[in-house]
Amino acid sequence: MDLKSLIRDIPDFPKPGILFRDITTLLRDRQGLRYTIDFLAEKCSEANLNIDYVIGMESRGFIFGTPLAYKLGAGFIPVRKKGKLPAAVHSIEYELEYGTDCLEVHRDALHPDSRVLIVDDLIATGGTASATAKLVQQIGCELVGFGFIIELRDLQGRKHLPDVPIISLVEY
């Protein structure tokens, strides 16, 4: 299936000069959504990642991470922006182009030596994915890979990620 044909391009969003890759058109397509989850699960199985948990990055990582976890027989754990989780958290601050941001995960969500796959809809510069990787590694988890629906190759996000399998289904 040609997933690119199901992803809408929106020029000048959220600001002039940016070409936004809109996944809502992929999400509304029944066959496209099913194929996306099945294909990502197949790639994870082929890589023999033996995942305990899928980590979904806020917020579109939740959309793909939850059904992927189900398909792989793993648990799903959300990583959220600061202040969005109600219980005690592990957190990490990371650099943005202009300032910093913070990611959090519940303290009781992950256990040392858990094998985790980090999932999001898109990798661009790799900043958020890299911070999520550092967060789960600080907890003592084994990061076994990343899964992305879209990869923006020109932004070279891969070079900021640990040396583990990186699965992307569509490249621009």
UniProtKB/Swiss-Prot annotation:
The protein's matches in Gene3D superfamilies, at most eight in alphabetical order, are given as: 3.40.50.2020
EC number from the UniProt entry: 2.4.2.7
Query: Which segments cross the bilayer?
Result: none
Q: Which molecular function terms from Gene Ontology are attached?
A: adenine binding; adenine phosphoribosyltransferase activity; AMP binding
Q: What class of enzyme is it?
A: transferase
Keyword terms: Cytoplasm, Glycosyltransferase, Purine salvage, Transferase
The subcellular localization recorded is:
Cytoplasm
Asked if Glycosyltransferase is a keyword of the record, the answer is: yes
Describe the reaction catalysed, as an equation.
Answer: AMP + diphosphate = 5-phospho-alpha-D-ribose 1-diphosphate + adenine
Identify the metabolic or biological route this protein is part of: Purine metabolism; AMP biosynthesis via salvage pathway; AMP from adenine: step 1/1
Identify one Gene Ontology CC term for this UniProt entry.
Answer: cytoplasm
Q: Does the keyword Cytoplasm apply?
A: yes
GO biological process, any: purine ribonucleoside salvage
Spell out the SUPFAM superfamilies in the cross-references. PRTase-like (SSF53271)
Which superkingdom heads the taxonomic lineage of this protein's source? Bacteria
Pfam families, A to Z = Pribosyltran
In terms of InterPro entries, this protein maps to:
Ade_phspho_trans, PRibTrfase_dom, PRTase-like, UPRTase/APRTase
SUBUNIT field? Homodimer.
- Return the similarity comment: Belongs to the purine/pyrimidine phosphoribosyltransferase family.
Q: Which HAMAP family match?
A: Aden_phosphoribosyltr
Function per UniProt: Catalyzes a salvage reaction resulting in the formation of AMP, that is energically less costly than de novo synthesis.
Q: What is this protein's record name?
A: Adenine phosphoribosyltransferase
- Supply the source organism for this entry: Nostoc sp. (strain PCC 7120 / SAG 25.82 / UTEX 2576)
What does the record give as the organism's lineage? Bacteria, Bacillati, Cyanobacteriota, Cyanophyceae, Nostocales
What gene name does this entry carry?
Answer: apt
